[in-house]
Amino acid sequence: MTIYGLIAYLIFVTSSIASPLYIPVIPPISEDKSFNSVEVLVSLFPDDQKDYTVTSQFNNYTIGTKDWTINVLSTPDGLDIPLTNITYWSRFTIGRALFKSESEDIFQKKMSILGVSIECKKPSTLLTFLTVRKMTRVFNRFPDMAYYRGDCLEAVYVTMTYKNTKTGETDYTYLSNGGLPAYYRNGVDG
């Protein structure tokens, strides 16, 4: 039995020596296939927060209220365009958080991914990965992702838009946790 183990070991060692480990290298992306404008819009229902705080550091951007927190996170060496314009507003029980940035001369030349998390402050074990409803693939980038943890909101919608302002090309991903809230499905009177 040990002879078979020795043969398997020799095959493994010789095949490892003959074919060194292959690590693919992703070449830089050309300027016409890269973007220089990023926008992440998060819509929440029902929501009527008035006070919020904004925090940003190391490709992690956060808007927080007394009920929930929204994080937009990029890979550690990912997004070259920092999301500098971060705002929140609420109207008709729908809250919107906008993370945005645009640059004239900085283009995203390497593969990147954006992740969005919406988390209720009240502890909960409910975790929902938002479903991709629509997505275009113009630029070379990894697919976006988003999740919602908690039960303080009925509906969560996330739209991520990427644009090359020189060519006008636009790429976007639309994610949500479901259809319309029951309030709209059943009508105002129920």
UniProtKB/Swiss-Prot annotation:
Gene3D superfamilies hit by this protein: 2.60.240.20
Domain of life: Viruses
UniProt xrefs under Pfam families: CrmD_SECRET (PF07190)
Similarity comment text for this entry: Belongs to the orthopoxvirus OPG209 protein family.
Protein name: Protein OPG209
Organism for this UniProt entry: Monkeypox virus
